[in-house]
């Protein structure tokens, strides 16, 4: 017969939670670095969609 499963220990739970938070922190740091490079104008290694207002201003000049 099927037996009830054992409760996950607090240490295992904390370990999984720490891994999840670590991955989230790394993604947040990457997003912040990307945003900073776009705002500072140091974005040479990637492409991102331009706003329509910026395109209209460039077309008028």
From Swiss-Prot:
Pfam families: Ribosomal_L32p (PF01783). Transmembrane segments: none annotated. Disulfide bonds: none annotated. Keywords: Ribonucleoprotein, Ribosomal protein. It comes from the Bacteria. One of its GO terms (molecular function) is structural constituent of ribosome. Residues 1-23 are annotated as: Disordered. One of its GO terms (biological process) is translation. Belongs to the bacterial ribosomal protein bL32 family. PANTHER family: 50S RIBOSOMAL PROTEIN L32, CHLOROPLASTIC, LARGE RIBOSOMAL SUBUNIT PROTEIN BL32C. HAMAP family: Ribosomal_bL32. This is Large ribosomal subunit protein bL32. The gene is rpmF.
């Amino acid at each position: 017969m099927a037996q009830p499963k054992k409760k996950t220990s607090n240490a295992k739970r904390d370990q999984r939670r720490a891994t999840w938070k670590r991955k989230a922190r790394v993604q947040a740091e990457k997003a912040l670095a990307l945003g900073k490079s776009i705002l500072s104008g140091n974005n040479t290694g990637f492409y991102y969609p331009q706003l329509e207002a910026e395109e209209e201003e460039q077309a008028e000049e």
